[in-house]
Amino acid sequence: MDNPQPELPMPFPAQASDMPLLPARMVNEYQYCPRLAYLEWVQGEWADSSDTVDGRYRHRRVDKPGGTLPEPADEGDGERFHARSITLSSARLGLIARMDLVEGEGSVVTPVDYKRGKRPHVARGAYDPERVQLCVQGLILEEHGYRCEQGILYFAESRERVPVRFDEELRALTHNAISGLRFIAAGGQTPLPLEDSPKCPRCSLVGICLPDEVNFIRDEKIAPRPLAVARDDALPLYIQARGAKLSKKGETLEVSIDDQKIQTVRLI
């Protein structure tokens, strides 16, 4: 289970002068997994996966700046605008975000965040980490004088736009994630990994985080899960025999016991 215990709301402290601005993406990571956010934000760890590479490829268009974000206009004034790849920050909130797209008219704006993959069929239209990241963008836009009541998540593979309202519940969840990230960053102690979570196998930092290995050391009753294979066209090779030896010969792997070959496996 990820975290079955209820969470108490954290206070939203003022930004310390010596603390760097928190990127919206890191608030997303904290909501997804506090340990992942700590490894990336505090320790500077990073590893690519097929998902992250594909995500960058799909973002290549929206990452190119285009259009301008005008100053907030009076109600009913101003033309509709689209501004791409806009970076805004708030010193008061201690936040910074690069927004894929901001749509607006006058003082009313809507941030649009592009995501790879298809829209998930869940009650709120999207998972909390993505909703929180979008809400951070809305909070920053409000700090700059705009009215921002909702955002849009655009899922590239299914080509669907999912509206996300910035209601009080989502705002509270977002403030709690911001405070939680600041708390663990200031604490200097790596959070424990999730336990038996389906989030871990596809995480790009699973080889650095080692969730199952760390949990097994902490409690031997927690059995390690089978290896997660990054490629769906390949299979893992398990060798459990005592005294077995693995060697590579050309494009094959050979398994032997007492110098007697017992298995040959072709590499893909």
Spans of model-derived segments:
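Metal-dependent nuclease catalytic cores that hydrolyze phosphodiester bonds in DNA/RNA
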Residues: 1-111, 118-122, 132, 223, ...
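Metal-dependent nuclease catalytic regions and adjoining charged, substrate-binding loops involved
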Residues: 2-13, 92, 124-125, 140-226
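Short, histidine-centered active-site or binding-site loop motifs used for metal coordination
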Residues: 114-118, 155-157
